[in-house]
């Protein structure tokens, strides 16, 4: 899921959908929709106030991945290095934004390589590192860690604040050889519905999601990062049916 035209369209559909419409989108788009901002300027609709949250799904998490022998341990060390951002993706746009915010624009050589070639490019020293955004643990970061040995950069509190994104900590040991917590940023993503969904349906959907979450984590590791604590990222109201389930399991929202 990306903060893309598709995510905007998911929210716009609320104006015409009825009943059991369920969609995923970053919470920031719900805020914009309900306040007539950004892509929703001039497209205000009272139905946007009927949007209700159900549960979080894996966030898009920023990774600045460097070869372990690159000598890079903090963002400022990127000056003079060759970095792969990719093209057109959320991670590429976000990575370019961060370089500018952190005073590195023009100081980092950007490699003209596609992101799907990042791991071999890192291994053959064509690049010093790459930037990727995905739910952690990200498969390409695991592959890089296993094949080359990596460092994943942490951001300072000031850098996180400048990004205007949500702070996220990737636990130590998530990636082979990376034995300390990684402080980074994320774009939360949440499953939403509308108030017309019955309380019982919302309750069952939410209950089944959390019951299945551990099974999903066994087949796709990034589901392990989804915890009830991520409900803190929700913007707007949570559906009454979902609230009933959270109350049952003792989760404060």
Predicted regions and their residues:
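Bilobed "Venus flytrap"/periplasmic-binding protein-like clamshell domains
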Residues: 1, 56-124, 228-232, 236-241, ...
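A generic structural signal for alpha->beta connector loops
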Residues: 48-51, 80, 107, 149
